[in-house]
Amino acid sequence: MISFSHWNSHIRSGLSLSMIPSANSRFAFIIQRNYIPVVNSQNTRWKRLCGTQSVWSPYKKKHVLVNRLKHISLFPKPIFARKFTTRQKSEDQKQWRILRITFLVLPFTVGGLWILYRVKNRKNNIFSFDELELEERSNRPRSIFGKIKQFFNILLRSFNLFIIFSPIIITLPFIALISFLHLRSLSSLTVSIWLRFLVTQLERAGATFIKLGQWAASRTDLFPPAFCKTLSKLHSHVTPHSLAYTQSVICKTYKVESIEEIFVNFNPIPIGVGAIAQVYTATIKKAATQQDNSYFTSMLQSIGFRQKNISDAPVTQDVAIKVLHPNVEKYISLDLQILGFFAKLINLVPSMKWLSLPDEVKVFGAMLNQQLNLHYEALHLNQFRLNFRGNRYVEFPAPYDDYTTNQILLEDYMPGIPLSAFLKHKSGPFNKLLANTGNNALFQMLIVDNFTHADLHPGNVLVKFYKGIPKTIFNQDNEINDSIYKILSTCSTEEWDSAMEELNILGYRPTLVFLDAGLVTKLSTQDQKNFLDLFQAVLTFHGYEAGLLMVERSRQTERVINKDIFALKMEHLLNEIQKSTLSLKSLQIGTILQEVMTMAREHHVRIEANFANTVLSILLVEGAGRQLYPEMDLLSNATPYLRSASSKSNVSLTNPMVQLWIALEARQFLLLSTSKETVEKWVKSDMIAPNI
């Protein structure tokens, strides 16, 4: 029991004393006053309690904590308690200083590093690719009942597919015999009818097989050209799902009772129906972000600034809404497992192993999984917008990140004229600019960014017109109305020519808008090197060396048939092109690459899927460009992009990108310093790029 009579005088003088007792602990005294006088060091009672002379100083403000009392069981020593033992004074002050600095500096350091990491690695979406892949793996059935249910679903789906494709399987040996008798040509009437029937059955089989046919049409390295050409006509004749389903998905996703709470107008008729999803147009009440295509806004977004929230944007905005079909994920998952089983079965045949069908099914499945999760398309659009920021002639629709889920993609509605309308009329003052713009966009994707749109057919490209400069935050009213675009899309050739001339006189300029970015291609370092080496070989007509390089760098070198003959065929192909070419600008790179892919198939030279997709993109863009402007010089368009990429890469003469850039620069110099006739003569006589 402690007597506190000693403290009465201090309490009367204005000191406040509090004691916090606890069993098996120490007492702590907190003395509060505006200032505290020096305690008499001769006071024996104080010395008996404290065990030492007090180190308090006059006029010490606020609280003083005394925690080292002898002969008394006090609290466990607090971490911030200051010790007053003279012997430990310097050590305690040093520890206190270290603790204080640590607890003050550490939160700011960690927080600052986290902010820097977020700004540097920020993608304009709340999801990353790793998170999406984790989400896909988590959707797989884990329980025994789920696996049993999935097994029976696979059996039912297999039976359904067997009924659909049984006529194809039964007639296949007969068709193979006819093809063999006609010297392996698939151009006969019977085979053509069979191929059209195959297309019909693929359309009946559903989304997976529609996409499978479209994918096979791009793999000229695996299938005959006539087969690929027929499959390229495959379209998704899918019945649109009901409006009620779309409304239920939107209400469930956005947690509203009706779509009128979000949209002012909602067009119930879809503007596009695909194998996996369909697209509507609507007017949103409050835009989730202030959609702005200006360079300044894009620059701010690239360094981490987010756009305004929905509550800050009172204006309406026209949007496009992509909604997945019901149960499409379930059916595609079942189909991929069935395809994987049959791919492994076919791979057991020795003559079919070079195709590596199980690997191709994995690549095809990864492609479909990207399209089944609309977050991927939003990520791709954001990346394309970042890559092309400041480009006045190329646009991508801006996705609304806060409104995008794996089932719904909300993005800007982009009015415009389909590029197919320009290809149909084939005349106009903007054709040359459109052809060069498309090629420039392709080379930036392929060479500079290594992030290429993998579905560049004309249906996914629109043309918008701006007056002088594109729309910015300072200039909003320089764009043509959507109704005018619809009229132009359906007008006759005479009306078309007149309208284009009038737009040109008024100062309007075209801008390409790329849609449907669900699929992209990224070449690995080795694939990019192979592509540039092949591109350089085509330019310099070194066919034999290019053929040997393709064989050496293929995935299954041991399965290649007649390596030397393949290299000789490459040399013969480029020699024939060299002799028949009137000028270098008339080189059709896409056609040459397609011939190379055909020879690779005949000799079992294994080509990577991304490499094949890149060749397909070049074929599509070059084909459309030459229809618009037959005199287009593809190689001249590639030169500035190779120059830019070479300056950023390893500047070495062994770098294929640097070599290709030097070759194109030399060609440009020759064209400027001599006549075209002289250059063409040098090319034909093999003086510029001799074959050794």
Swiss-Prot record:
GO biological process terms on file: mitochondrion organization
Pfam families: ABC1 (PF03109)
One GO location term (cellular component): mitochondrial membrane
Molecular-function GO terms, alphabetical: kinase activity
Transit peptide: 1-91
Protein localization: Mitochondrion membrane
Predominant localisation class: mitochondrion
Disulphide bond pairs: none
Entry keyword set: Membrane, Mitochondrion, Transit peptide, Transmembrane, Transmembrane helix
Entries under InterPro entries matching the protein: ABC1_dom, ADCK2_dom, ADCK_kinase, Kinase-like_dom_sf
Membrane topology: Multi-pass membrane protein
Residue intervals passing through the bilayer: 96-116, 161-181
Family: Belongs to the protein kinase superfamily. ADCK protein kinase family.
Protein name: ABC1 family protein C21C3.03, mitochondrial
Species for this entry: Schizosaccharomyces pombe (strain 972 / ATCC 24843)
